[in-house]
Every structure is written in C-alpha cells, then in structure tokens.
C-alpha cells in the first residue's frame, strides 16, 4: 500500500513523499531542500529512500537532490532536456518507469520550462499526476522559458487524463489562484464554493492538495479557455478579440502575472 505525504519546504513548496508500507521503501518528488526529507527518514529509520523524481530544473525543485543522493544512494530520475543534479535516468516523453511498484508514464509538458515533465500513474480508481509547476490547483505555472502556445498545449494534454486523476502539484498557491479565478468568472458558483472551502482549510493550517481533474475543469480558468465567459473576460483585458484558445490563455496568463 502506498501513502502520499506532503513535506513542506521553503515558503510554499511541497515535496511529495510516497511511502510503501509493505516494503518500507519511499520515494520523493522535487526535493528542493534535503532537510525535510532527511528529517522524515530520521523519524522513520526503517524506511529507505529508493527514488527521487524531478519534474524540472528550478532550484526549489532540485536543490536537495545532491545531498539526498549522497546520503541515501537513491536513484535520480529527471527530464533529459534539462540539467538535473546527480541524475541517473534521463526521461523523455512517453517513457515508462516503475517506482515502489507503481508504473508511471512521462508526459512532456513544456511551458514553465522547456524540458518540464509530469509523472502520471494510471489506475482504475485513483490515477495520480505529479504535475510540478505546470498544472496547479486552480492555476498554472508562469512562463519562464516556453511560449503561451506550448503551455496551453501542455495543459490541454493533461486535461485529457481521467477526471478522477488526483493532482499533486508543487506549491500551495490555491488561495491566490482561486481569487484570480473568481476575478475571471465572478458568477461561477463552483469557484465561490471552492474559495470558501480553501479559506477555511488554510485558516486551520490544512493543505489544499491534492486536487482532482474534474474540479480543475470547473474552477481553473486556464483549463476553461473554451468557455464564453472566460473568453469575454480575456478579450476585455486584452482590449481585443482573442481568436484562438491559446490567445485566450496568453491573455489570462499575462493578467495573472500582474494580479
């Protein structure tokens, strides 16, 4: 049985830890800092870190890799198109890998960075997606390297996964993302309900993740570029007609950058 835990790091990062109760092995996703992981291992001395999964090269996702590799000899898997410290396995689109007995498929999702990847585990009841900084709860990552067209295509690809897919993204940005989503769609009751719920959770110091794809399709403006209300608001912000969904996305992303 696999349990998934969020290890907080820095101001708003989550390092996801997968714990295999049967084998007493574990894996982590995007350890920007080694300390939370080493602390967990100290508290669970019977567990061995076997794998480190990396979605992209930003330091808040890879900063702890070298120290963890040295301490545990864990296997490091990350995107082939980016420079990843201590990487053992270079991954490209459609690659398959097995971690703690779970098979994951690699999805290339350029936009936030050009080589960004996501890890998807297909399951009949609870599929899993570790989306890094591509798809957030109610939002998406900034475009540091890619184009709006690339990021929109990446999000559209992820949107084709099953609605039951659990979304494990790397940051606690949900509250600010929902406030932006409400500015885009002030009459969307799903957004209003989710915002109230997340406000309550955060006031109780609870995390807002994981999300799920069905909820994202109802409340994430970056997955709703087909919606008339979203396009109209994007047109209003850009003072013109956005003639494609990627143009609507670009308008929304530019607005969010200054929100």
Curated annotation (Swiss-Prot):
Pfam families: HAGH_C, Lactamase_B
Entry-linked InterPro entries: Clx_II_MBL, Glyoxalase_II_hydrolase, HAGH_C, Hydroxyacylglutathione_Hdrlase, Metallo-B-lactamas, RibonucZ/Hydroxyglut_hydro
Gene3D superfamilies: Ribonuclease Z/Hydroxyacylglutathione hydrolase-like (3.60.15.10)
Region of interest: Disordered: 224-245
Domain of life, source organism: Bacteria
Feature: compositional bias, Basic and acidic residues: 224-238
SUPFAM superfamilies: Metallo-hydrolase/oxidoreductase
E.C. no: 3.1.2.6
GO molecular-function terms, A-Z: hydroxyacylglutathione hydrolase activity; metal ion binding
BP terms from Gene Ontology: methylglyoxal catabolic process to D-lactate via S-lactoyl-glutathione
Enzyme class label: hydrolase
UniProt-annotated binding residues for Zn(2+) 1: 56, 58, 112, 133
UniProt keyword annotation of Zinc present: yes
Keyword terms: Hydrolase, Metal-binding, Zinc
The keyword Hydrolase is annotated on this UniProt entry: yes
Residues engaged in binding Zn(2+) 2: 60-61, 133, 171
Cofactor annotation comment: Binds 2 Zn(2+) ions per subunit.
Assigned protein family: Belongs to the metallo-beta-lactamase superfamily. Glyoxalase II family.
Role played: Thiolesterase that catalyzes the hydrolysis of S-D-lactoyl-glutathione to form glutathione and D-lactic acid.
Subunit structure: Monomer.
The protein's name: Hydroxyacylglutathione hydrolase
Naturally occurring in which organism (per UniProt): Pseudomonas savastanoi pv. phaseolicola (strain 1448A / Race 6) (Pseudomonas syringae pv. phaseolicola (strain 1448A / Race 6))
């Amino acid at each position: 049985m696999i349990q998934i835990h969020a290890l907080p790091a820095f101001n708003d990062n989550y390092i996801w830890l997968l714990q295999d109760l049967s084998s007493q092995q574990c894996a982590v996703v995007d350890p920007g800092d080694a300390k939370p992981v080493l602390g967990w291992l100290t508290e669970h001395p019977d567990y061995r870190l076997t794998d480190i999964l990396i979605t992209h090269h930003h330091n808040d996702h890879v900063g702890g890799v070298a120290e963890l590799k040295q301490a545990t000899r864990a296997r490091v898997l990350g995107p082939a198109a980016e420079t990843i410290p201590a990487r053992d396995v270079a991954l490209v689109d459609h690659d398959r890998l097995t971690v703690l007995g779970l098979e994951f498929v690699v999805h290339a999702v350029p936009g936030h960075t050009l080589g960004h990847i996501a890890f998807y585990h297909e399951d009949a009841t609870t599929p899993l997606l570790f989306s890094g900084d591509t798809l957030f709860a109610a939002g998406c990552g900034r475009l540091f390297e890619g184009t709006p067209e690339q990021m929109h295509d990446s999000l559209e690809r992820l949107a084709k996964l099953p609605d039951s897919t659990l979304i494990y993204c790397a940051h606690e940005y949900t509250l600010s993302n929902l406030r932006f989503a409400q500015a885009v769609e002030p009459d969307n009751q799903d957004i209003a309900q989710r915002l109230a719920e997340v406000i309550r959770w955060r006031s109780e110091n609870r995390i807002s993740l994981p999300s799920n794809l069905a909820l994202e399709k109802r409340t994430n403006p970056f997955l709703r570029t087909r919606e008339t209300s979203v396009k109209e608001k994007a047109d209003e912000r850009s003072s013109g007609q956005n003639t494609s969904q990627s143009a609507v996305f670009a308008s929304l992303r530019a607005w969010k950058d200054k929100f």
